[in-house]
């Protein structure tokens, strides 16, 4: 069922031709800014992984991966949901040292995504991962990295405004940090998404920390798989979307689990069966580097900076009939 929302009086900010130019500009400029900010090396990434490897992201635990068999190699493969675990293994295989990292273009299919203005079954991200020292597994280090990423985003937005003077999106470089428990304490009677909207109305750039574990209410703010982020050292970068008047996630990131936090989180999540998978065995045995990483939505960033009201304006995907009809009637072209 369609959940599309068209703001009253909305008109596409650019022609289709100029839109493509702007998308190209954002992706090229931000990739350079991100690489400079985080000292990353670009690498090639897989579109699919072997099911038995345990490398795919289980997301919230109920999403079904797109799967297919490969007769010639006698294996079942899955199109990736994300590269969170693959990147960590790649850092070991490619022999990256502390302070060095990688980034890559990640393309995923999330078939069970509930599509709306912000969500598509097609996910495109800049994925990054960095080797860190054990003493860097702390909140201060996490916050410094968040500020670096937000700075790169704002630099690209400033450059876009010069290249395309008709675009006027303003982004706030000043990051407000708050934990999910602090946010629940502020708005105990609201849903997690309503809480995000409330805090983003006050602070237009927020890093919402500690996502995955249960809060005092007995529920987590949002789902996170237990085997990549440390739930005490992760979060989402949220920015205010002036077109849709809502909180707008541009990045999910965090310091990754070590052997101790993985052991604890697998038990809390009821996922002890994963301990026998190759990736998880290596991690529990301390054979993988300590890392932090995340993903930054490419279409999300384009949508925000350009001022589009629907993610289908900046990426090509498949939509339900009600959504395509509503957008057509409003003069919105879905790619």
Residue spans of the language-model regions?
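A translation/RNA-centric and nucleic-acid-associated enzymatic feature enriched
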Residues: 109, 180-335
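Extended, charged alpha-beta segments that form solvent-exposed binding/catalytic grooves
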Residues: 104-190, 194
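Extracellular structured ligand-interaction cores
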Residues: 100-102, 123-127, 203-205, 245-247
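A generic secondary-structure signal for well-formed alpha-helical elements
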Residues: 34-41, 149-160, 309
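A glycine-rich phosphate-binding loop feature that marks nucleotide/adenosyl-phosphate handling sites
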Residues: 47-51, 165-172, 322-324
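Class II aminoacyl-tRNA synthetase-like tRNA-binding/catalytic domains
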Residues: 2-119, 129-131
């Amino acid at each position: 069922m369609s959940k599309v929302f068209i703001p009253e009086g909305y008109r596409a900010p650019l022609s289709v031709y100029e839109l493509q130019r702007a998308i190209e500009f954002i992706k090229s400029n931000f990739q350079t800014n991100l690489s400079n900010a985080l000292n990353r090396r670009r690498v090639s990434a897989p579109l699919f992984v072997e099911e038995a490897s345990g490398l795919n992201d289980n997301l919230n635990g109920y999403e079904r991966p797109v799967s297919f068999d490969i007769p010639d190699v006698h294996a079942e493969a899955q199109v990736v949901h994300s590269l969170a675990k693959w990147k960590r293994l790649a850092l070991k295989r490619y022999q990256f040292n502390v302070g060095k990292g990688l980034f890559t273009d990640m393309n995923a299919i999330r078939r069970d995504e509930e599509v709306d203005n912000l969500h598509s079954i097609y996910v495109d991200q800049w994925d990054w991962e960095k080797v860190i020292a054990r003493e860097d597994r702390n909140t201060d280090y996490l916050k410094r990295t968040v500020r670096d990423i937000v700075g790169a985003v704002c630099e690209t937005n400033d450059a876009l405004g010069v290249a395309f003077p008709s675009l006027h999106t303003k982004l706030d470089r000043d990051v407000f940090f708050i934990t999910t428990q602090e946010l629940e304490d502020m708005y105990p009677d609201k849903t997690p998404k309503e809480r995000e909207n409330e805090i983003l109305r006050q602070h237009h750039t927020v890093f919402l920390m500690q996502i995955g574990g249960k809060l005092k209410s007995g529920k987590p703010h949002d789902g996170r798989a237990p085997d990549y982020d440390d739930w005490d050292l992760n979060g989402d970068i949220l920015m205010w979307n002036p077109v849709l008047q809502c909180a707008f996630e541009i990045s999910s990131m965090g310091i990754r689990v070590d052997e101790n936090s993985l052991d604890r989180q697998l038990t809390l999540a009821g996922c002890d069966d994963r301990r026998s998978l190759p990736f998880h065995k290596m991690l529990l045995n301390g054979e993988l580097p300590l890392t932090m990483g995340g993903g930054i939505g490419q279409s999300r960033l384009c949508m925000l900076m350009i001022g589009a009201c629907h993610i289908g304006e900046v990426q090509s995907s498949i939509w339900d009939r009600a959504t395509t009809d509503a957008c057509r009637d409003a003069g919105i072209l879905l790619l």
